[in-house]
UniProtKB/Swiss-Prot annotation:
Carboxy-S-adenosyl-L-methionine binds at residues 91, 105, 110, 130, 152-154, 181-182, 196, 200, 315. It catalyses: carboxy-S-adenosyl-L-methionine + 5-hydroxyuridine(34) in tRNA = 5-carboxymethoxyuridine(34) in tRNA + S-adenosyl-L-homocysteine + H(+). It comes from Escherichia coli O81 (strain ED1a). Catalyzes carboxymethyl transfer from carboxy-S-adenosyl-L-methionine (Cx-SAM) to 5-hydroxyuridine (ho5U) to form 5-carboxymethoxyuridine (cmo5U) at position 34 in tRNAs. The lineage of its organism: Bacteria, Pseudomonadati, Pseudomonadota, Gammaproteobacteria, Enterobacterales. The keyword Transferase applies. Keywords: Transferase, tRNA processing. This is tRNA U34 carboxymethyltransferase. Its EC number is 2.5.1.-. Belongs to the class I-like SAM-binding methyltransferase superfamily. CmoB family. InterPro entries: CmoB, Mo5U34_MeTrfas-like, SAM-dependent_MTases_sf. GO terms for biological process: tRNA wobble uridine modification. Pfam families: Methyltransf_9. The keyword Kinase does not apply. Homotetramer.
């Protein structure tokens, strides 16, 4: 059973304590009524993992844990088998005691694009919206963050996160809650808020930007990463039934239009930090994610287009400040 008591105890002592007015009841409701049919199977995989305290832990350059003495072949096989029970692994990679989880996404490449543009994360309390398996939260901790809180309603991601946490010595500097941002009160408590790979899935993107703003302290920093298309400040793509085989893609603005959206929501010091085409080296099928990936979603005769004929995925990073 995944227990959130440590997180409650942690925030009871800090500026997030007012969250306890609503959070425990929400989590209790989720535990009672909303668990996925496979959740027990996934949580069992976490439970059966060994508790290991890493002798060497690198969260600055990667997510890598090593023991003082190499694990036996049997121990490594046990860890690998249990982690494979949590497939598909989409966000990573992770290197854990000789088990190398080669995830669909090279999330480390995204982090390398984002990190140089951020305010120093040292000592910061961070919210990561749509955090997936929590890979980037561990990198935030590696960059000096005091506390990283992730929210993502996908329950497999929660179990993946808890599995990695257990293999990192039950590290309590990062926590994942199975919630969507619409379930959070306006906490106004985070120094930095990340929303990466979420905006295009929202039916109301401006509402999402307001929700992000409501989580920031005054002078806090927003890090927004999302799909964009080429064009001027008035260019927005509204895909038909699917975009790159995804049904739940609603709005893809140009980077300049997105800058205007942020301005309209009251953000200042808005800058476009990076624009990059997503490659089939960064997102691809692996033995830890064996179903279709980006190469299957692009036009086989023109990789500059999706199978539906839209521009192929391009992602921008924008940084903004809440005044």
């Amino acid at each position: 059973m995944i227990d959130f008591g440590n997180f409650y105890s942690l925030i009871a002592k800090n500026h997030l304590s007012h969250w306890l007015e609503t959070l425990p009841a929400q989590i209790a409701n989720w535990q009672r009524e909303q668990q996925h049919g496979l959740f027990k199977q996934w949580s069992n995989a976490v439970e059966f993992l060994p508790e290991i305290k890493p002798y060497h832990l690198d969260l600055l350059h990667s997510v890598t844990a090593e023991s003082e003495e190499p694990l036996s072949a049997g121990q490594i096989k046990r860890i690998e088998t249990l982690m494979r029970n949590l497939m598909p692994w989409r966000k990573g990679p992770f290197s854990l005691y000789g088990v190398n989880i080669d995830t669909e996404w090279r999330s480390d490449w995204k982090w390398d694009r984002v990190l140089p543009h951020l305010s120093d994360l040292t000592g910061r309390t961070i919210l990561d919206v749509g955090c997936g398996s929590g890979y980037h939260m561990w990198r935030m901790i590696g960059a000096g963050a005091h506390l990283a809180v992730g929210i993502d309603p996908t329950q497999l991601f929660l179990c993946q996160f808890e599995a990695v946490r257990k293999l990192l010595g039950n590290d309590q500097r990062a926590h994942l809650l199975p919630l969507g941002i619409e379930q959070l009160p306006a906490l106004k408590a985070f120094d930095t808020v990340f929303s990466m790979g979420v905006l295009y899935h929202r039916r109301s993107p401006l509402e999402h930007l307001w929700q992000l703003k409501d989580q920031l302290v005054n002078e806090g920093e927003l890090v927004l990463e999302t799909l964009v298309i080429d064009g001027d400040e008035n260019t927005v793509l509204v895909p038909g039934d699917r975009y790159a085989q995804m049904r739940n893609v609603y709005f893809i603005p140009s980077a300049l239009a997105l800058k205007n959206w942020l301005k309209k929501c009251g953000f200042v010091d808005i800058r476009i930090a990076d624009v990059s085409v997503t490659t089939t080296e960064e997102q691809r099928r692996t033995e830890w994610m064996v179903t279709e990936s980006l190469a299957d979603f692009l036009d086989p005769h023109d990789p500059g287009k999706t199978v539906e004929g839209y521009p192929a995925p391009k992602r921008a990073v924008l940084i903004a400040r809440k005044p």
